[in-house]
């Protein structure tokens, strides 16, 4: 493992959006690395807000593989989300879920287990710090991710109209 000072830093903002819950949803990612900004979004026709929040974080961490292809490894990632579900889930709750065989404290199956497993796997590949940011509070990175997530919703709705 490299020392923190040797690692390349990546700052990521993610967001999910849903019109109805469940309903058409979208996710958005704004990634800053080495003076470059990458923005991308997507969506699903029938989903939930929590699935979209998780998918945004997953897509963001998957994008890091393209940075690795360019020789960037051992990335120090600061991932900002306005979803306490994602932030607390990946940094606090997941440890108990795994110990209990992907069950919650009250012995119910963890919702979105496949997405949580994927997020857990991806987050192990780098040094990821998870930050919660209050949504719709004027934070530029979060506001941009929110706009991208809404573009994801619109892309799904426009496909339905075709």
UniProtKB/Swiss-Prot annotation:
Compartments where located: Cytoplasm
GO cellular component terms, A-Z: cytoplasm
A GO BP annotation: DNA replication, removal of RNA primer
Q: What is its EC number?
A: 3.1.26.4
Which coarse location class describes where this protein primarily resides?
cytoplasm
InterPro entries named among the record's database cross-references: RNase_H, RNaseH-like_sf, RNaseH_domain, RNaseH_sf, RNaseHI
- Which reaction equation describes what this protein catalyses? Endonucleolytic cleavage to 5'-phosphomonoester
Binding residues for Mg(2+) 1, per the UniProt record?
15, 53, 82
Any GO MF annotation of the entry:
magnesium ion binding
Top-rank EC class of the record's enzyme? hydrolase
Pfam families the UniProt entry points to: RNase_H
Q: Which CDD domains match?
A: RNase_HI_prokaryote_like
Summarize where Mg(2+) 2 binds, as residue positions: 15, 146
Q: Which residues form the RNase H type-1 domain?
A: 6-154
Gene3D superfamilies from the entry? Ribonuclease H-like superfamily/Ribonuclease H
Write down the PANTHER family for this protein, in alphabetical order.
Answer: RIBONUCLEASE H1
Protein name (database record) = Ribonuclease H
Q: Which organism is it from?
A: Nitrosomonas eutropha (strain DSM 101675 / C91 / Nm57)
